[in-house]
């Protein structure tokens, strides 16, 4: 499973345009295989920003969606017209924990890890950002990026201890922004 985390900062007054593109893309996205989960969240510290969080079966499914011509037109409109900034992180899930089950945290990769906690309340983690679902108010996700295995292990255990219902750790393969596209895939 692969996670995609699209943090976006629409220009003032452009959030409705973002959702117009979302509505236009829904039936097209439904035709693509591999999307497991999609929700949109507002950061608790910035009501003008948004996170689109997606889980995909594999990298090929993400590539197929990224290459869709209608989606590419929306991407271009976002970059050129609607967004002040964005950040996209993509990576494979390398660990999954719940209140009753867990994977071995000792086998995590060494760096570029993103700890993601899900639950009915924001989880307070060091250097993390918490978001509330736009589609399902009262559902939260907390993202904690960390560069080393030991810190990610501590944060994961702390999040479960705070009541996170579900926790996933992703090894980030690509991390790029509107202005730094050095890790962006080629069109």
Where are these regions (language model features)?
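A short beta-strand-loop micro-motif that forms or neighbors metal/cofactor-
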Residues: 78
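Short S/T/G/P-rich N-terminal loop/turn motif that feeds into the first structured element of a domain
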Residues: 1-49, 60-67, 81-187
């Amino acid at each position: 499973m692969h996670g995609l985390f699209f943090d976006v900062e629409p220009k003032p007054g452009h959030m409705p345009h973002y959702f117009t593109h979302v509505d236009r893309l829904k039936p097209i996205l439904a035709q693509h295989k591999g999307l497991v989960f999609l929700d949109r969240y507002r950061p608790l510290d910035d009501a003008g920003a948004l996170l689109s969080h997606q889980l995909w079966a594999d990298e090929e499914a993400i590539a197929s969606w990224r290459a869709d011509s209608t989606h590419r037109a929306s991407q271009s409109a976002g970059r050129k017209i609607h967004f002040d900034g964005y950040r996209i992180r993509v990576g494979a899930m390398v660990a999954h924990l719940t209140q009753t089950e867990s994977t071995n945290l000792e086998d995590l990769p060494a760096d570029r890890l993103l700890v993601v906690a899900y639950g009915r309340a924001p989880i307070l983690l060091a250097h993390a950002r918490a978001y509330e679902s736009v589609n399902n108010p009262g559902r939260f996700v907390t993202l904690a990026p960390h560069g080393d295995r030991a810190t990610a292990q501590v944060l994961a255990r702390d999040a479960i201890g705070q009541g996170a219902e579900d926790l996933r750790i992703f090894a980030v393969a690509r991390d790029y922004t509107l202005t730094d596209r050095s890790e962006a895939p080629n069109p």
